[in-house]
């Protein structure tokens, strides 16, 4: 591996000036402003909840935004993942030797609190770039060049990033998996026993309706780096687009489709977000009518009626449960969304929940089209 990622520092978005993403992250999802930078036509606002940090880059300018680049993408998008590495200069040399393109070479930024060094690497995943950051010893609240903002305690709904899901073109997962392995040290994480890394986990969603292929990647076991999930469509017999194909069309190619945010209490978090105006996906009614679903929910210590009212999905076995709720898209283009996830011993993603998400997205698309 050329530059093993040690932890996720932040996820960056690029949106037009005035787009409400930063406001919504605060008002609906409980993120709190951490630091800001305004220069050269850019307004860069870092927001935090627990260890999860989002950097919202608004506007455009003659120079690149600090710690990233301007993707010149036609729609709002999650455009950058920033990872901490041990030595940026060494990582850049190793990546260059592998043929990687670095639109921003190793750059040092200094302020009164210390120094950080970063480089930006183009990835094969659409408009997604990767920032490799070295900031050991930096004493500021975020990064050099940013002005710290007064810290106000938030509701604590989100503790950290659980996983990152990339929407990929059909057949591209093996190539992407090798790239992330060779360049950042990610390894295949089986989602089912005996899973072939080249094939991933196939989740069929219905007769003739295709499905999804999921390939999960992680760095070292017990690492704080979130799991990376590659999602691509499986061909079906109908012309109906699934959520991955819809993302590729509306986003203009592959990219970061959603971020799974870990919550220690999905009941409180989903209820609070809904009261704040959050738009959560409604699971299909049949999901809660499945044989054994009520008993499964009761065994987890929850009330079926409440989970259904909040749109919370539950999957699991014995004493290990997975609870998930998904937002509608944060952008008008109906692309990127967020997921809240609470794990009660479960480590996977729940095939039944994946099918329910697929159907929820299809039903939401049908409602939007008035069909």
Swiss-Prot record:
Keywords: Dioxygenase, Iron, Metal-binding, Mitochondrion, Oxidoreductase, Repeat. It catalyses: 3-(4-hydroxyphenyl)pyruvate + O2 = (S)-4-hydroxymandelate + CO2. Binds 1 Fe cation per subunit. GO terms for molecular function: 4-hydroxymandelate synthase activity; 4-hydroxyphenylpyruvate dioxygenase activity; metal ion binding. Fe cation binds at residues 163, 258, 339. It is found in: Mitochondrion. Its EC number is 1.13.11.46. It is an enzyme of class 1 (oxidoreductase). Its main location: mitochondrion. InterPro entries: 4OHPhenylPyrv_dOase, 4OHPhenylPyrv_dOase_C, 4OHPhenylPyrv_dOase_N, Glyas_Bleomycin-R_OHBP_Dase, VOC. GO terms for cellular component: mitochondrion. GO terms for biological process: aromatic amino acid metabolic process. The keyword Mitochondrion applies. Its cofactor is Fe cation. Coiled coil: none annotated. The keyword Oxidoreductase applies. Residues 7-135, 160-328 form the VOC domain. PANTHER family: 4-HYDROXYPHENYLPYRUVATE DIOXYGENASE, 4-HYDROXYPHENYLPYRUVATE DIOXYGENASE-LIKE PROTEIN. Belongs to the 4HPPD family. Iron-dependent dioxygenase that catalyzes the conversion of 4-hydroxyphenylpyruvate (4-HPPA) to 4-hydroxymandelate (4-HMA) in the mitochondria, one of the steps in the biosynthesis of coenzyme Q10 from tyrosine. This is 4-hydroxyphenylpyruvate dioxygenase-like protein. It comes from Rattus norvegicus.
């Amino acid at each position: 591996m050329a530059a093993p990622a040690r932890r996720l520092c932040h996820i960056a978005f690029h949106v037009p000036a005035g787009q409400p993403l930063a406001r919504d992250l605060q008002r609906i999802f409980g993120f709190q402003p951490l630091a800001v930078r305004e220069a050269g036509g850019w307004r860069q606002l870092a927001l935090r909840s627990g260890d999860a940090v989002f950097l919202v880059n608004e506007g455009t300018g003659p120079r690149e935004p600090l710690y990233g680049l301007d993707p010149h993408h036609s729609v709002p998008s999650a455009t950058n993942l920033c990872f901490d590495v041990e030595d940026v200069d060494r990582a850049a040399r190793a990546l260059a030797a592998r043929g990687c393109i670095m639109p921003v070479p190793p750059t040092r930024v200094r302020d009164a609190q210390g120094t950080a060094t970063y480089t930006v690497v183009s990835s094969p995943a659409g408009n997604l770039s990767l920032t490799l950051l070295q900031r050991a010893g930096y004493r500021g609240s975020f990064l050099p060049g940013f002005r710290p903002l007064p810290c106000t305690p938030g509701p604590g709904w989100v503790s950290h990033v659980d996983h990152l899901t990339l929407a990929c073109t059909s057949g591209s997962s093996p190539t992407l998996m090798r790239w992330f392995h060779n360049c950042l040290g990610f390894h295949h994480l089986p989602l089912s026993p005996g899973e072939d890394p080249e094939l991933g986990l196939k989740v069929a969603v219905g007769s003739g309706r295709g499905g999804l292929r999921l390939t999960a990647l992680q760095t070292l076991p017990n690492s704080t780096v979130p799991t990376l999930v590659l999602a691509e469509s499986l061909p079906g017999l109908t012309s109906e687009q699934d959520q991955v194909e819809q993302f590729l069309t509306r986003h203009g190619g592959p990219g970061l489709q959603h971020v799974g945010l870990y919550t220690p209490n999905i009941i409180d978090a989903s209820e609070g977000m809904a009261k704040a105006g959050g738009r959560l996906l409604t699971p299909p009614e049949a999901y809660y009518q499945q044989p054994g679903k009520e008993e499964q929910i009761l065994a987890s210590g929850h009330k079926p009626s409440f989970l259904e009212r909040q749109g919370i999905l539950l999957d699991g076995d014995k004493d290990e449960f997975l609870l998930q709720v998904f937002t509608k898209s944060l952008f008008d283009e109906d692309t990127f969304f967020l997921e809240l996830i609470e794990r009660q011993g479960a480590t996977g993603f729940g095939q039944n929940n994946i099918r329910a998400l697929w159907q929820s997205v299809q039903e939401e698309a049908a409602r939007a089209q008035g069909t």
